[in-house]
Amino acid sequence: MHVQPPTFGEYAERAKAHGRRMAANQAILADDTVVVCNPNNPTGTLLSPNDVLRMHRDVRNSGGELIVDEAFIDYCPDATVRHHVQDGLTVVGSLTKILCIPGVRLGYICAAPEQIARLQERAVTWSLNVLASAVAAELPRHQAEIAADAQANQARAERFARCLQEMGVRVTAGRVPFLLADFGHDMTKTVQHLRAQHILVRTCDSFGLPTNYLRLAVKTDAENDLLMKVLYRENFDAR
């Protein structure tokens, strides 16, 4: 299996747990299963559908398969390739990210019929609970507000990124509900101080990044301002 860090780490962890050979920061080898997050987590990098399909063609030519994780695609729906699934191209996604209900374990897989059949043979019994099933049934009624929230998130993210950059923080932003922030120094103590104030931020060690990086969720403008105020006090007031 091939993954390219920094990215969501659980694919590599699961592969290692099942004894699969892992490759990262290396050329793609013949017969590799390549996993790419689009948009990427934590960088927010977004590939166009043409880029993804071109990648799929190259991976197939080497005898491999491509898995595209579109967990955050509701924030940039024009980039999805789930309508282009074919042999060797599998798309997985989440139905709860944009609704901010991660505790409802609900997602989907789009793949060629033969791949779906293989996955169904391995699926665990009762993989979908009644709460998740009820949420899935309601989703079609909320497509307009989901689209509106994606647009509003983009405006909040741009404002949040601009304010952090004015503080001297290097920010990587995209069409996602988070920012990757490089503070240039170890943020371990700041994370602890934030937690003591009931503010949680994501450290990035699981993505393969050093402790000067944090992934910051894009919330309301008021909540973003509160976080920036605390970050400034913790990291810049004393300078």
Tell me what each language-model feature is:
Residues 154, 166-197:
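Conserved PLP-binding catalytic core of the aspartate aminotransferase-like
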Residues 103, 175-176, 208-212:
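Short acidic/glycine-enriched loop/turn segments that link adjacent beta-strands
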Residues 48-50, 196-197, 206-239:
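PLP-dependent enzyme catalytic core of the Aspartate aminotransferase-like
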Residues 30, 186-193, 223-226:
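Short, conserved charged micro-motifs
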Residues 16-18, 23-75:
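Active-site phosphate-binding strand-loop segment of PLP-dependent enzymes
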Residues 88-172:
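PLP-dependent aminotransferase class I/II
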Residues 1-14, 21-27:
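Conserved PLP-anchoring active-site segment centered on the Schiff-base-forming lysine
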